[in-house]
Amino acid sequence: MKLVAVADTHGEHCRLTIPDGDVFLHAGDLTERGTLEQLADVAEWMRALPHRHKLVIAGNHDFAFERKPKEARALFHGLTYLEDEEVTLDGVRFYGSPWQPWFHSWAFNVRRGPAIDAVWRKIPAGVDVLITHGPPMGLGDKVWDGERVGCEDLLRHLPRVGAKAHFFGHIHEDRGEWQHGVTRVVNCTTSEGELPATVVEL
């Protein structure tokens, strides 16, 4: 299965040339301000892509998914929006979650420690592909000043989950791929459309 992944398009999705594949996935920050109008534009663009399956989660900029969830989800008809949910496509299990450790006053914030650990405990063991908006600690999480800002609790859950691949964005400065146990860990940020989509063969 060929996966084509992006994150952090921030409304600049039309700048991207999207490769062919079986599954297109967006790991959040579809928009800049998270309005319903901005989400509608992204949804229309995604529906026009030729991929058989299209998955999306929200990011910290995508406020409407948190403030007006019913209206936001309705815009993504014909696409698969995941919010602490699982879907199986062609026998492959995908799980998506938008939450991140508390970050200023953005959307989908959860306090570090027990609160966010409870979020990650919902991820079923044995999913094949995990999609979160933010990174685990120490992998694809280094910001411009060298600080690591990923989630320690998410990192701790990766071995239990045992996914073949974990996609995320959020940190524009640390795009790349790493191996953590059995899991291929991928920061697929496009940094507002400046970087290409990431392609992974599962």
Regions of interest found by a model, annotated:
Residues 2, 53-55, 80, 93, ...:
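Proline-centered loop/turn at the N-terminus of a beta-strand
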Residues 1-10, 27, 91-100, 128-133, ...:
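Active-site-proximal beta-strand elements of phosphoester/diester hydrolases
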Residues 92-129, 147-153:
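Binuclear metal-dependent hydrolase catalytic cores centered on His/Asp/Glu-rich metal-binding motifs
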Residues 31, 36, 103-104, 126-164:
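Active-site-proximal segments of metal-dependent phosphoesterases and phosphodiesterases across multiple
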Residues 86-90, 153-161, 165, 172-202:
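Binuclear metal-dependent phosphoesterase catalytic core
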Residues 10, 30-31, 60-62, 86, ...:
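Catalytic metal-binding/acid-base residues of hydrolase active sites
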Residues 39-43, 71-79, 111-116, 145-155:
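Charged helix-capping and loop-helix junction motifs
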Residues 6-89, 188:
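Core catalytic region of metal-dependent phosphoesterases/phosphodiesterases
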